[in-house]
Amino acid sequence: MDYYHDNKMEKIFKALKQPKNIEDLALSDAFVKGLILKIIASYGTVQTSMINDITGLHWDILEENITQLEKTGFCAPVSGSFLFSSVQYSITKKGREKVKGIAEENPYIGVAPVSYEDYYQIMKTQMYHRFPIEIPPKVVEETFKDVVGVGYAKEALIESCIIGKGIFVYGPPGTGKTFVISKMPDLLPPLIIPKYIEFGGKVIQFYDPDFHKKCDEQPQDPRWVKIYAPFVLTGAELSMNKLETNYNPNKGVYETSPIIKANGGILLIDDLGRQRDDHELILNRLIVPMENKKDVIYVRGIPVIVHSHFIPAFSTNLDISIMDEAHLRRAPLHIFLKNPEVEEVAEVFQRNLEELQETYDLEILDRFMNVYQSKNLGGEGLEPSFAHARDVAQICQSVRINQGKNNIDIEVLEEALGKHVLIVLQRMKIDIAQIAHKTRSFRVKANDLEKASQGLLDYGAQLIARENSSIIVDLDENVTPVELADYLSKKNIQIDGIEIIAESEKELRRTLLGW
């Protein structure tokens, strides 16, 4: 027994023996027969071993139900032997007519679901008194072995997992917020979840391989799966609709929301404040499942209570004031991640090169550090960023291969630095946050284009093009033709006309061209 498979987990394993009869399966006879018949119809002719693989049903249940379907004329054996597992069955005309009605009502084909009652009880057993957790030192050490620095952040993350309370992480871009939060699930014990559950004849999907990583040891009943604590990451794409469980008619299942998929693990709302929907609405939607550890989904309009024992984590590049007091109470622990030290960024850069199995001249490490050292020390004075370290290492690999070299030298590094967009923008002293502001494009008609151009540049305009007796410029969205005309008049620049020709988001391309 260990942290990832304790006595409680072993007891659950013993309880999850594969059912051998319909009563223990806790699914209706009609549901089981309908599932089998849909599989036979979809294949046309199929071997019973394939039906067994798809449904996860015990051979006793499978043989009993297929035999009954055969007797009622819905399917017929077409080949096989004395072994039931090698018999092939085909759908009959009568069976095909029967399947039409079943599939219209419930098109799901797959592993047999678990009953709602069994799901609820098993989850309740696992989540009862889950916190506080005693995390072994070996688990902590293994979890953070590839995390450089940020000792204070590690402590807060550990404490969040011990007591099961939410955490709020904020700070400048590139400081590793998402990365450190992604380590939290490794601190938590695993759990067992159903792949699917049945409620009112409908199927709800719980297991999602995109978020749920299987453990090596699995229960005997294949309808259940033991997973490591999940890490469910949502970002700017998150919307109110995505926080709900929605029906997928193509699969014939209700697909659970991130709130439910994160049960037993971490739900990270990344880039808080960047979502299309108001972040206040999103946070308000999370309050009930965070507080009650349960959420409600609707199946045919009927409310179904499901478990949502997740630890909420929020990250943002914005200020902590983006969350009000009611929301912060659900995430009482906080971490401010400042820009890392130059030495830490260099260490991450070196680690990434080694992970990429790149050989390199040692002098490139000093040159890389020089990018972030202060100008007083002879450096470029750029803001240190863990994200830069990873990206530049990968770009170095690309440049080295493209140049046909065997190792990364200063020349390769210099070219890689010159190709990293954020490093280039910092060198140009361009604030990326300002680039998204709207601009107005003006057509300015003037007799003396040279004098008018200089006056517009002095005003802060960005010259785009000239056409005949006009100049096309970009200015801030708040500038009006009257204000611009008044300014040029005071500069003794004769203007024949000013008109707004477009309003748009400021383009990075134009910013770079104007440098």
Question: PLM features: residue spans?
Answer:
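A short, conserved structural fragment
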Residues: 70-81
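Short, amphipathic alpha-helical interaction segments positioned at domain boundaries
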Residues: 89-133
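Dynamic helix-loop-helix/coil hinge segments at AAA+ ATPase domain boundaries and subdomain interfaces
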Residues: 128-153
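Conserved ASCE/P-loop NTPase catalytic core
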Residues: 145-313
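Conserved AAA+ ATPase core "coupling" helix
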Residues: 280-283, 323-355
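Conserved AAA+ ATPase small/helical "lid" subdomain
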Residues: 349, 356-412
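C-terminal engagement/docking regions of AAA+ P-loop ATPases
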Residues: 409-438, 449-452
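C-terminal coupling/interaction segments
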Residues: 481-515
